[in-house]
Structure formats: structure tokens, C-alpha cells
């Protein structure tokens, strides 16, 4: 009887240890993609958007002219792609 209690306690302790190890490795795996994505999409001063002479897609075109390939929408005053039926 004592031998069975000891083996059950040892088995239970082994399962708890296995759970802790698996949980720790899984939490490390969850953090890895977050760290990877944050390093990929980190904003660097060298890559900040520069001021343009023309307005790009979905930018206001009241004061600036739209860049090549875009037209100023008469309804919304944004630079948009030209509609195929308006060419």
C-alpha cells in the first residue's frame, strides 16, 4: 500500500514537472514571433516618409497636385486611381 502511494506521488510529481517544462517552452515560442515582428516593423529614422512635391494615393489634393498615375477626385478631393470608364 505504501509502495503504491509512493509510485503515485512520484508519477504525479513527474507530470507536474513535465507540465512546467512544456509551459515554459511554449511561452518562449509565443514571444519569439512577437519579437521578430517588432524588429521587422520597427520604425527607423532613415526610413521615415519624406515630404513630397505631389500627393500620393488617398492624400488630400487641394493644395498639392497628385503624383503620376493618380487623379484628383472631384467628389472627395483625394488622389485616387483613375476609373477605367473615365479614360
From Swiss-Prot:
Molecular function, one GO term: toxin activity
Keyword Membrane in annotation: no
Keywords: Disulfide bond, Ion channel impairing toxin, Knottin, Secreted, Signal, Toxin
One family name in Pfam for this protein: Toxin_12
Disulfide bonds: 54-67, 61-72, 66-79
Localization, UniProt: Secreted
GO cellular component, one term: extracellular region
Source organism, top-level taxon: Eukaryota
Propeptide, residue positions: 25-52
Entry keyword Secreted: yes
Segment forming the signal sequence: 1-24
InterPro entries recorded: Huwentoxin-1, Huwentoxin_CS1
Tissues and organs where the protein is expressed, per its UniProt entry: Expressed by the venom gland.
Domain description: The presence of a 'disulfide through disulfide knot' structurally defines this protein as a knottin.
Function: Ion channel inhibitor.
Protein's name in the database: U3-theraphotoxin-Hhn1a 14
Native organism: Cyriopagopus hainanus (Chinese bird spider)
Amino acid at each position: 500500500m505504501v509502495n503504491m502511494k509512493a509510485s503515485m506521488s512520484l508519477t504525479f510529481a513527474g507530470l507536474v514537472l513535465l507540465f512546467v517544462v512544456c509551459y515554459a517552452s511554449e511561452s518562449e515560442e509565443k514571444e519569439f514571433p512577437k519579437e521578430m515582428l517588432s524588429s521587422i516593423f520597427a520604425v527607423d529614422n532613415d526610413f521615415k516618409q519624406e515630404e513630397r512635391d505631389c500627393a500620393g494615393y488617398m492624400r488630400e489634393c487641394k493644395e498639392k497636385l497628385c503624383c503620376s498615375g493618380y487623379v484628383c477626385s472631384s467628389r472627395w478631393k483625394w488622389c485616387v486611381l483613375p476609373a477605367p470608364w473615365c479614360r
